[in-house]
């Protein structure tokens, strides 16, 4: 469990690092923490001894990362933890709980069995670790306490633990959330761990071992699971902000001893006659309105004098009042448990010892339920790695190696580390008979190289160079490629060539140079290659092109083409489906032969194809084509054409759009200018535009009358004693009423569908 709420305080200061950050270091591991973590996996079917399997592979991972683990075993549990252990045993071994509860006649020794069952599990783990050559140490009490002690005195570089109690025991560097898996919430590629360094945390926030002990007393820990009721993390942190690390424990002890002092502080904090902002005599409300004479202010007062101090004192008084409700607070046994240390520093040999393959197969194989050949496959690389690391030391001592490298097979790269794959041999026959013949025969059926593959391992290149330099050097030399021979001849010195002219001439006469044979390459024929333009022009003209029998008949027909061509082109008259090769030479000749020739065909189906340039002005042409007004709109226009003409008169449209919709020029060409009234009488005023849009007919022009004096324009233009403006308005209103009546008639219609 550890100290409650401690991880939430320290987690913001943790660093997530890969496990290779621990390379070359010694780390103390709380073995009980790993075992409990494995035993709590009950959500799905797992290995019957999952804790042993998990311990083996985790330890192997640390060995591959060149980390030296030191496992710390549990000692005698403190009496303060007896209640917590009893509750854990009930939860862990509830399936084998005795039927009858313990009676008062039972002795205390029989009831308080301690960790008998758990110690048996730890003993199995110790046997596994000793066979792997890993050191196990047993502390006098809690494992995390002894691991913190080793870290505090520099025997190990850190502690791997999930229990926050190790901080209360004085651990300096703690590794939490150790993970070698690539799945789950704590997954990381290649393994990762959270690093908590108390030296950095203390320098940032003045938070050390003593404050952690106070937090354990107030919030709760393994020795007082409930803590003090009503006190949480926020209240404790406010207390830590007020006092330093070195004085926090003494302040906590004085809560019960200095009663008079805290009673006086409580009276001062609650006194209404003292301002809560500045602490001077006077109510807070009066100081806010009239000011404070001591602070020398006319309005308000100095809040920095008393307000923050009053709040911190009040928070401490609240914590004190709640804590003193517990008669044993502060519990000196808990404080001494966290601060006590072994009297002497042990002289421990924490190095990696030689693994014992035979012991692992004989004692641990049946616990893990692994066959002998599988145990050999998993354990043999551990033995070879230890031998590679300790090769220099063992050679100096003169110890005989169990296995020897035969040769290097190939280069390998493991997680970015240059490595080599080796083949080993057992010269002394130490491992003969460990694997049954039946398992060997089954292995040989699946692996073509046979039992030899069991002796293949992969080791780092730098370790092999230090352990077996001759073997590595010979392998690397065999892999070196010979230098390439220079194929390019060196240039001769011109001076030497001049000096040896006679010899050079003699060599040339003796070995005359053979003339080079020039081979003409034939071009591969291309299928239906497209000829160039010059090839078209070089061909025969019209006489050379194939002509159909129907050509004389077509020649008698009049030409109906607006292109200025003076003669027929036979290739144009042929069908597109003819099998004759497509030839455009006659087309090109027809275009370039006489470009100034006049067309002979000028009309087609009654329409003129070629027009002569207008010598006169366009306005003169319009005047010649102007007709009488009674001939306007003789033929009804299609709705689309009428709509286009209306749009050509809209001013808000751009000029390019109006010009594209205007069909005046087309009508001019056809001679139908009489159908466009706005070309005869252009629109000049908004009134003319309104007349045109609503198709308002005009009266015949009246004979010219001399304008009367003082008469308006519209009255002067009147006819039949009516004003022209009034006639215009009446006609427009009449059109609107007629449109409304048409809409009403359409609404009265009922359409019956099929």
UniProtKB/Swiss-Prot annotation:
Principal location listed in the UniProt entry: nucleus
Assigned EC number: 3.1.-.-
Region: Disordered, residue numbers: 479-533, 732-754
Residue numbers binding Mg(2+) 2: 163, 165, 222
Keyword Cell cycle applies: no
Annotated compartments: Nucleus
Bilayer-spanning residue ranges: none
UniProt cofactor(s): Mg(2+)
SUPFAM superfamilies documented for this protein: 5' to 3' exonuclease, C-terminal subdomain, PIN domain-like
Region (I-domain): 130-226
Keywords: DNA damage, DNA repair, Endonuclease, Exonuclease, Hydrolase, Magnesium, Metal-binding, Nuclease, Nucleus
SMART domains associated with the record: HhH2, XPGI, XPGN
Annotated spans, N-domain: 1-90
UniProt biased composition (Basic residues): 514-523
GO molecular function per UniProt: 5'-3' DNA exonuclease activity; 5'-flap endonuclease activity; DNA endonuclease activity; double-stranded DNA 3'-5' DNA exonuclease activity; four-way junction DNA binding; metal ion binding; single-stranded DNA 3'-5' DNA exonuclease activity
GO cellular component: nucleus
UniProt xrefs under InterPro entries: 5-3_exonuclease_C_sf, GEN_chromo, HhH2, PIN-like_dom_sf, XPG-I_dom, XPG/Rad2, XPG_DNA_repair_N
Keyword hit for Calcium: no
Positions with a binding annotation for Mg(2+) 1: 30, 74, 142, 144
GO terms, biological process: DNA repair
Function field: Endonuclease which cleaves flap structures at the junction between single-stranded DNA and double-stranded DNA. Specific for 5'-overhanging flap structures in which the 5'-upstream of the flap is completely double-stranded. Prefers the blocked-flap structures similar to those occurring at replication forks, in which the 5' single-strand overhang of the flap is double-stranded. Also possesses weak 5'- to 3'-exonuclease activity on nicked but not gapped double-stranded DNA. Does not cleave bubble-like or Holliday junction substrates.
Family of the protein in this entry: Belongs to the XPG/RAD2 endonuclease family. GEN subfamily.
PANTHER family associated with the record: FLAP ENDONUCLEASE FAMILY MEMBER (PTHR11081), FLAP ENDONUCLEASE GEN HOMOLOG 1 (PTHR11081:SF70)
Identification of the protein by name: Flap endonuclease GEN
Primary gene name: Gen
């Amino acid at each position: 469990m550890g100290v409650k709420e401690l991880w939430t305080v320290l987690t913001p200061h943790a660093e997530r690092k890969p496990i290779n950050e621990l390379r070359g270091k010694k780390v103390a591991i709380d073995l009980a923490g790993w075992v409990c973590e494995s035993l709590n996996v009950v959500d799905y079917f797992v290995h019957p001894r999952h804790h042993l399997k998990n311990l083996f592979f985790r330890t192997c991972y640390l060995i591959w990362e060149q980390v030296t683990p030191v496992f710390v075993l549990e000692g005698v549990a403190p009496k303060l933890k007896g209640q917590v252990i009893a509750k854990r045993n009930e939860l862990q071994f509830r399936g084998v709980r005795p039927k009858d509860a313990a009676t008062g006649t039972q002795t205390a020794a029989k009831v308080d069995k301690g960790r008998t069952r758990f110690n048996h599990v730890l003993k199995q783990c110790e046997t596994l670790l000793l066979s792997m050559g890993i050191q196990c140490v047993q502390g006098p009490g809690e494992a995390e306490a002894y691991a913190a002690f080793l870290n505090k005195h520099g025997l190990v570089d850190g502690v791997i633990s999930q229990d926050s109690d190790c901080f209360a025991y004085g651990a300096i560097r703690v590794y939490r959330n150790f993970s070698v898996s690539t799945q789950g919430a704590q997954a990381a590629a290649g393994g990762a761990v959270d690093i908590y360094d108390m030296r950095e945390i203390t320098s940032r926030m003045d938070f050390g071992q003593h404050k952690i002990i106070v937090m354990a007393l107030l919030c709760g820990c393994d020795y007082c699971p409930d803590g003090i009721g009503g006190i949480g993390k926020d209240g404790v942190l406010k207390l830590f902000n007020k006092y330093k690390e070195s004085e926090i424990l003494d302040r906590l002890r004085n809560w019960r001893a200095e009663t008079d002092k805290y009673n006086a502080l409580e009276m001062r904090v609650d006194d209404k006659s003292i301002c809560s902002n500045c602490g001077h005599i006077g109510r807070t409300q009066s100081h806010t309105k009239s000011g404070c004479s001591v602070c020398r202010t006319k309005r308000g007062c100095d809040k920095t004098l008393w307000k923050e101090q009053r709040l911190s004192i009040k928070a401490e008084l609240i914590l004190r009042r709640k804590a003193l409700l517990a008669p044993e607070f502060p519990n000196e046994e808990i404080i001494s448990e966290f601060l006590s240390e072994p009297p002497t520093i042990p002289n421990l040999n924490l190095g990696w010892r030689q693994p014992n393959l035979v012991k692992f197969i004989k004692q641990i194989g049946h616990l893990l339920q692994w066959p002998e050949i599988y145990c050999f496959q998993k354990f043999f690389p551990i033995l070879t790695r230890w031998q590679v690391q300790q090769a220099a030391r063992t050679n100096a001592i003169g110890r005989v190696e169990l296995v020897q490298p035969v040769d290097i097979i190939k280069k390998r790269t493991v997680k970015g580390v240059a490595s080599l794959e080796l083949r080993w041999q057992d010269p002394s026959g130490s491992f003969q008979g460990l694997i049954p013949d039946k398992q060997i025969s089954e292995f040989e059926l699946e692996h073509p190289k046979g039992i030899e593959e069991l002796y293949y391992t992969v080791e780092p290149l730098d370790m092999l160079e230090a352990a077996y330099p001759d073997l590595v050097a010979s392998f690397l030399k065999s892999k070196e490629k010979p230098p390439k021979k220079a194929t390019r001849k060196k240039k001769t010195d011109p001076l030497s060539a001049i000096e040896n002219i006679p010899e050079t001439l003699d060599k040339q006469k003796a070995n005359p140079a053979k003339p080079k044979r020039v081979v003409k390459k034939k071009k591969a024929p291309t299928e239906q290659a497209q000829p160039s333009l010059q090839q078209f022009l070089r061909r025969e003209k019209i006489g050379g092109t194939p002509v159909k029998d129907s050509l004389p008949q077509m020649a008698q027909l009049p030409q109906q083409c607006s292109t200025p061509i003076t003669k027929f082109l036979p290739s144009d008259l042929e069908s597109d489906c003819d099998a004759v090769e497509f030839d455009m030479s006659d087309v090109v000749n027809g275009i370039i032969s006489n470009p100034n020739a006049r067309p002979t065909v000028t009309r087609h189906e009654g329409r003129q194809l070629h027009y002569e340039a207008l010598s006169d002005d366009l306005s003169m042409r319009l005047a010649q084509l102007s007709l009488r007004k009674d001939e306007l709109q003789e033929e009804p226009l299609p709705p689309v054409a009428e709509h286009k003409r209306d749009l050509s008169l809209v001013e808000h449209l751009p000029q390019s759009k109006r010009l594209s919709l205007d069909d005046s020029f087309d009508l001019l060409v056809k001679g139908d200018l009489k159908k466009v009234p706005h070309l005869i009488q252009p629109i000049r005023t908004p009134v003319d535009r309104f007349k045109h849009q609503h198709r308002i007919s005009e009266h015949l022009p009246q004979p010219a009358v001399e304008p009367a004096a003082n008469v308006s324009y519209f009255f002067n233009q009147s006819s039949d004693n009516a004003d022209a403006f009034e006639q215009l308005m009446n006609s427009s209103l009449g059109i609107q009423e007629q449109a409304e009546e048409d809409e009403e008639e359409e609404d009265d219609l009922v359409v019956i569908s099929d």
